[in-house]
Amino acid sequence: MDIVSIAWAALMVVFSFSLSLVVWGRSGL
């Protein structure tokens, strides 16, 4: 694995995690 694929994987994880936090926040958790 090169640094580009690692950076993309980390970016997708952070994006999906922040998106789920926004959804949970709007649902009134």
From Swiss-Prot:
GO cellular component: chloroplast thylakoid membrane; cytochrome b6f complex
GO MF annotations in UniProt: electron transporter, transferring electrons within cytochrome b6/f complex of photosystem II activity
Pfam families named in the record: PetN
Membrane topology listed for this record: Single-pass membrane protein
Superkingdom to which the source organism belongs: Eukaryota
Subcellular location(s) of the protein: Plastid, Chloroplast thylakoid membrane
Oligomer status and interactors: The 4 large subunits of the cytochrome b6-f complex are cytochrome b6, subunit IV (17 kDa polypeptide, PetD), cytochrome f and the Rieske protein, while the 4 small subunits are PetG, PetL, PetM and PetN. The complex functions as a dimer.
Role description: Component of the cytochrome b6-f complex, which mediates electron transfer between photosystem II (PSII) and photosystem I (PSI), cyclic electron flow around PSI, and state transitions.
Family classification: Belongs to the PetN family.
Official protein name in the record: Cytochrome b6-f complex subunit 8
Organism encoding this protein: Phaseolus vulgaris (Kidney bean)
